[in-house]
Amino acid sequence: MAHPSQLGFQDAASPVMEELLHFHDHALMIVFLISTLVLYIIVAMVSTKLTNKYILDSQEIEIIWTVLPAVILILIALPSLRILYLMDEINDPHLTIKAMGHQWYWSYEYTDYEDLGFDSYMIPTQDLAPGQFRLLEADHRMVVPVESPIRILISAEDVLHSWAVPALGIKMDAVPGRLNQTAFITSRPGVFYGQCSEICGANHSFMPIVVEAVPLEHFESWSSLMLEDA
Amino acid sequence: MSLAKPVMRGLLGKRLRFHLPIAFALSLVAAAGFKYMVTEPRKQAYAEFYKNYDAVKEFNTMREAGIFESVRPSGE
């Protein structure tokens, strides 16, 4: 989850998020390269009285400052497109979960084998136990088996919402009448938090997402227990 | 005594020929600095973390700490 005075991304908990982290580093390196160049030139320009009023054109510099930016753009585009297609791969998921956005909670349906469905409301601040996170905890978490490819189908029952979990590198709009599909694998067990990412009314900031990744046997025990309670 | 005629032309060009290579070199140094001080250490950190990562041990530690809701600590 996020922590105070955080500047960068949350630690990656999925291979896709690791790739996104490295791509961001690559793009930021190019940003620093260009910014340093421009800053130096600005300082050099303002700290001189020398001017040349009679320059009309210069083919050489025009070629340089056309070709160089084109090369830089290609250096950014190639890894970007690689990640874009990587994120689109859905390789034989072990489980399909439906996440439905409502005003103002999420509901999850695990219908591959049995009919398991539950709502996930934010735990109000006054009901938090010691150690729980304000505005991030939910009463029922979306439990998934760790290191298993999961397909998630996202939609909404009323207005636009967006299902986002930064540590997993996922953000997908929940659109009424539309099923959006994405997939993820959790690299390690743990609890990963997210928040609704599309303005959806008064309690838009108060419908968090909590994903809990546990080993398969514990996931199976949990789903059996949830089915009994239902 | 006669003085040498001062240079009166090409002053801006001379300044640019001096400063532009420094500008490009500095920007490449900044990019290389970021790459080797941030990007590569981050990649190494992730590789090191997962090289000897024991998911079962970490899961049990987290479980005993009580952070999961689907799995309670073994004492409960």
Curated annotation (Swiss-Prot), chain A:
This protein's name: Cytochrome c oxidase subunit 2
Subcellular localization(s) per the UniProt record: Mitochondrion inner membrane
Residue sites binding Mg(2+) per the record: E198
Physiological role: Component of the cytochrome c oxidase, the last enzyme in the mitochondrial electron transport chain which drives oxidative phosphorylation. The respiratory chain contains 3 multisubunit complexes succinate dehydrogenase (complex II, CII), ubiquinol-cytochrome c oxidoreductase (cytochrome b-c1 complex, complex III, CIII) and cytochrome c oxidase (complex IV, CIV), that cooperate to transfer electrons derived from NADH and succinate to molecular oxygen, creating an electrochemical gradient over the inner membrane that drives transmembrane transport and the ATP synthase.
Segments on the Mitochondrial intermembrane side according to the record's topology features: 1-14, 88-230
Signal peptide: none
Binding-site list for Cu cation A2: C196, E198, C200, H204
A molecular function GO annotation: copper ion binding
Transmembrane segments: 15-45, 60-87
Assembly: Component of the cytochrome c oxidase (complex IV, CIV), a multisubunit enzyme composed of 14 subunits. The complex is composed of a catalytic core of 3 subunits MT-CO1, MT-CO2 and MT-CO3, encoded in the mitochondrial DNA, and 11 supernumerary subunits COX4I, COX5A, COX5B, COX6A, COX6B, COX6C, COX7A, COX7B, COX7C, COX8 and NDUFA4, which are encoded in the nuclear genome.
PROSITE patterns assigned to the protein according to its UniProt record, in alphabetical order: COX2, COX2_CUA, COX2_TM
GO CC, one annotated term: respiratory chain complex IV
Swiss-Prot/TrEMBL keywords: Copper, Electron transport, Magnesium, Membrane, Metal-binding, Mitochondrion, Mitochondrion inner membrane, Respiratory chain, Translocase, Transmembrane, Transmembrane helix, Transport
Main location group: mitochondrion
Needed co-factor(s): Cu cation
Binding-site residues for Cu cation A1, renumbered to this chain: H161, C196, C200, M207
E.C. designation(s): 7.1.1.9
Reaction(s) this enzyme catalyzes, per UniProt: 4 Fe(II)-[cytochrome c] + O2 + 8 H(+)(in) = 4 Fe(III)-[cytochrome c] + 2 H2O + 4 H(+)(out)
GO biological process: ATP synthesis coupled electron transport
Protein family (similarity comment): Belongs to the cytochrome c oxidase subunit 2 family.
A Pfam family matched in the record: COX2_TM
Gene (UniProt): mt-co2
InterPro entries: CcO_II, CcO_II-like_C, CcO_II_C, Copper_CuA, Cupredoxin, Cyt_c_oxidase_su2, Cyt_c_oxidase_su2_TM_dom, Cyt_c_oxidase_su2_TM_sf
Cofactor note as given: Binds a dinuclear copper A center per subunit.
Topological domain spans for side Mitochondrial matrix: 46-59
